[in-house]
Amino acid sequence: SSDVCSSDLLIVRIFLALYMLYYIKRMKKNPKLNVVVVSKCMPSRSATCMAEGGINGVTDFSKGDSYELHCFDTVKGGDYLVDQDSTLKFCEQAGPAILELDYLGMPFSRTPEGKVKARPFGGASKVRCNYSADKTGHIVAHTCLDDALSNGVKFLMDHELLDVAVDNGRCEGAVLRNIRTGEI
């Protein structure tokens, strides 16, 4: 038998950290939002949990770093093949996302002054890779998951997206399959 699940916001998981930060932003604007996350696997088994290095994002502007410089480093690192407008938007959101994770209680590595610690990474021209020991992805995932669960987000594990119903450019529904049972 097929179940019908209703929500105000359906997030189909691609990258754990990204969808969780998106959810957090939306929930802050509308705390009564009914959110459902669809995932093929448990969040703790996602690729995000395997990431060790850190999160590139400008959190310290005092040493000449900027969103534009972060964008340039990213575009250069992508051999100038990446969409520059999208990259700039992403870079502008990375620093605030790191600060939001810090606010949520993510145990970042710290400087002696207590600030989120950053290190050089990936050929960037400035030190902006914010990290949590060598388990950044795992810790990001669990920080976001803890916050989501404490705010009533519903998770549909072991489900995959088959189709979406679009009306006038707006998603009005989704067809999912339970991977374990095959039910639609």
Could you describe each region identified by the protein language model?
Residues 18-21, 98:
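Generic hydrophobic/aromatic pocket-lining and core-packing "Φ" positions
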Residues 13, 17:
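N-terminal Rossmann-fold NAD(P) dinucleotide-binding loop
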